[in-house]
């Protein structure tokens, strides 16, 4: 068990000044118990905490670090921008055009794009745009999907909201809640029912094409295409929230992997290379409704700042030029097979879901295809498993309902170490 004396001291101090001691709820370890770990440094696939313990990192800053931490090309580019260019001007810069052009080239749905500062900003802006474009009010989301902490999305939400047992949040007005309808993930009939009950009133359907905030839940074959067809028939804007799976499951995201093109796409995490960046983009005729060209207002003081765009642009260029995706697939498949073999040896039948380098081990024997099946997972067993992995230097998300991310810089030795640790941790769940 790692010694966490300094982390414990810092957490006690933080609770005096920061609500719950953290700036994002899942970091407080409420789901798994124990002391939140304060990190001091990241390098490649590893992190070191303030007590000197080192961990193999499968959280990757909650997804952005597909290339690991402190990638030399990204670090060098940031140093150049910081010392030779500046951090922010509040004016247009040439780099904005460069990253926008690149996004239009690599993401199938994007003809125009607007940069923002977070995934939450991207999803909030995309929904507002869809409402303005269609002159309709209601949206359909899916139970357990998480689209940031905007009011419209905190109704049967995933991620930290689900982790803390509060998928619905106080502070969301009844009017807002009434305009958000929830369908069952992977159930097209539940969507059709809502559309028929609200004929002509649905502005958008927003979905994670790979649900990554209820653990990891892949879309069933044909489900995304059925949504695409329904939205086309009904004049509804289809929004793919690719904040997590964008640039992760393929260079062009889940829409490239599955061959289904939405009307709008929201992006975050990897697009910022570890700095706060988001974006939303899509069809030109829809995007042209955004101010100053159109009448749908959206703005941001630090949107498109050179420091954040440097990290994002360099990350995207590396992904485009080096194409790590086949190797990421191999590495993630190695872990999946290793975990399965371990469970077979121990007579266990827990569920593994994986899409590319996003994966989740659910502590349930029920196939996980939606919110209802995800919450059958045994959270106490996950907590035991989590700490048993942590004791062996493997850092996972402190929540059953988050993804495990494989990074391109992980070595075969790292993967073998993880499989061995998994066996020991699975044994611990049987005690």
Curated annotation (Swiss-Prot):
<dbReference type="GO" id="GO:0030170">
    <property type="term" value="F:pyridoxal phosphate binding"/>
</dbReference>
<dbReference type="GO" id="GO:0006782">
    <property type="term" value="P:protoporphyrinogen IX biosynthetic process"/>
</dbReference>
<dbReference type="InterPro" id="IPR015424">
    <property type="entry name" value="PyrdxlP-dep_Trfase"/>
</dbReference>
<dbReference type="GO" id="GO:0008483">
    <property type="term" value="F:transaminase activity"/>
</dbReference>
<keyword id="KW-0963">Cytoplasm</keyword>
<comment type="similarity">
    <text>Belongs to the class-III pyridoxal-phosphate-dependent aminotransferase family. HemL subfamily.</text>
</comment>
<dbReference type="GO" id="GO:0015995">
    <property type="term" value="P:chlorophyll biosynthetic process"/>
</dbReference>
<keyword id="KW-0663">Pyridoxal phosphate</keyword>
<keyword id="KW-0413">Isomerase</keyword>
<dbReference type="InterPro" id="IPR049704">
    <property type="entry name" value="Aminotrans_3_PPA_site"/>
</dbReference>
<keyword id="KW-0149">Chlorophyll biosynthesis</keyword>
<dbReference type="InterPro" id="IPR005814">
    <property type="entry name" value="Aminotrans_3"/>
</dbReference>
<keyword id="KW-0627">Porphyrin biosynthesis</keyword>
<comment type="pathway">
    <text>Porphyrin-containing compound metabolism; chlorophyll biosynthesis.</text>
</comment>
<comment type="subunit">
    <text>Homodimer.</text>
</comment>
<dbReference type="GO" id="GO:0042286">
    <property type="term" value="F:glutamate-1-semialdehyde 2,1-aminomutase activity"/>
</dbReference>
<dbReference type="Pfam" id="PF00202">
    <property type="entry name" value="Aminotran_3"/>
</dbReference>
<protein>
    <recommendedName>
        <fullName>Glutamate-1-semialdehyde 2,1-aminomutase</fullName>
        <ecNumber>5.4.3.8</ecNumber>
    </recommendedName>
</protein>
<dbReference type="InterPro" id="IPR015422">
    <property type="entry name" value="PyrdxlP-dep_Trfase_small"/>
</dbReference>
<dbReference type="InterPro" id="IPR015421">
    <property type="entry name" value="PyrdxlP-dep_Trfase_major"/>
</dbReference>
<dbReference type="GO" id="GO:0005737">
    <property type="term" value="C:cytoplasm"/>
</dbReference>
<feature type="modified residue" description="N6-(pyridoxal phosphate)lysine">
    <location>
        <position position="269"/>
    </location>
</feature>
<dbReference type="InterPro" id="IPR004639">
    <property type="entry name" value="4pyrrol_synth_GluAld_NH2Trfase"/>
</dbReference>
<comment type="pathway">
    <text>Porphyrin-containing compound metabolism; protoporphyrin-IX biosynthesis; 5-aminolevulinate from L-glutamyl-tRNA(Glu): step 2/2.</text>
</comment>
């Amino acid at each position: 068990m790692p010694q966490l004396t300094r982390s414990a001291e810092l957490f006690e101090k933080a609770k005096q000044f920061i609500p719950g001691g953290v700036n994002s709820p899942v970091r407080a370890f409420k789901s798994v118990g124990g002391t939140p770990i304060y990190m001091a440094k990241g390098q490649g696939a590893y992190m070191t905490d303030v007590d000197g313990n080192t961990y193999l990192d499968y959280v990757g800053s909650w997804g952005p670090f597909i290339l690991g931490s402190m990638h030399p090309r990204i670090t060098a580019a940031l140093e150049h921008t910081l010392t030779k260019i500046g951090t922010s001007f509040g004016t247009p810069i040439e780099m904005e055009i460069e990253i926008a052009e690149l996004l239009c080239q690599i993401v199938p749905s994007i003809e125009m794009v607007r940069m923002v500062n977070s995934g939450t900003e991207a999803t909030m802006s995309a929904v507002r745009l869809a409402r303005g474009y269609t002159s309709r009010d209601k949206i359909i989301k899916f139970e357990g999907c998480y689209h940031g902490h905007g009011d419209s999305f905190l109704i049967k939400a995933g991620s930290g909201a689900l982790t803390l047992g509060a998928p619905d949040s106080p502070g969301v007005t009844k009017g807002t809640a009434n305009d958000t309808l929830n369908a069952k993930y992977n159930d097209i009939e539940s969507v059709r029912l809502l559309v028929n009950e609200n004929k002509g009133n649905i502005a958008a359907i927003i979905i994670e094409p790979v649900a990554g905030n209820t653990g990891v839940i892949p879309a069933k074959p044909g489900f995304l295409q059925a949504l695409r067809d329904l939205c086309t028939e009904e004049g509804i804007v289809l929004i793919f929230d690719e904040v997590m799976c964008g640039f992760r499951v393929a260079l062009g995201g889940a829409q490239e992997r599955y061959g289904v093109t939405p009307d709008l796409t929201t992006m975050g995490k990897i697009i910022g290379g570890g700095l706060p960046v988001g974006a939303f983009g899509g069809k030109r005729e829809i995007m042209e409704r955004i101010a100053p060209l159109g009448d749908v207002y959206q703005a941001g003081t630090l949107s498109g700042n050179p420091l954040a765009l440097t990290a994002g642009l360099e990350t995207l260029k590396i992904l485009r030029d080096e194409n790590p995706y086949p190797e990421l697939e191999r590495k993630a498949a190695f872990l999946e097979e290793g975990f399965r073999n371990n469970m077979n040896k121990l007579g266990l039948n827990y569920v593994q879901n994986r899409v590319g380098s996003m994966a989740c081990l659910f502590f349930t024997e029920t196939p996980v295809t939606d919110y209802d099946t995800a919450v059958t997972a045994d959270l106490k067993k996950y907590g035991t498993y989590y700490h048993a992995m942590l004791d062996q230097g493997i850092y996972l998300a402190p929540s059953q309902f988050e993804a495990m991310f494989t990074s391109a810089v992980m070595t075969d030795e790292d993967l073998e170490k993880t499989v061995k640790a998994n066996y020991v941790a699975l044994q611990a769940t049987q005690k």
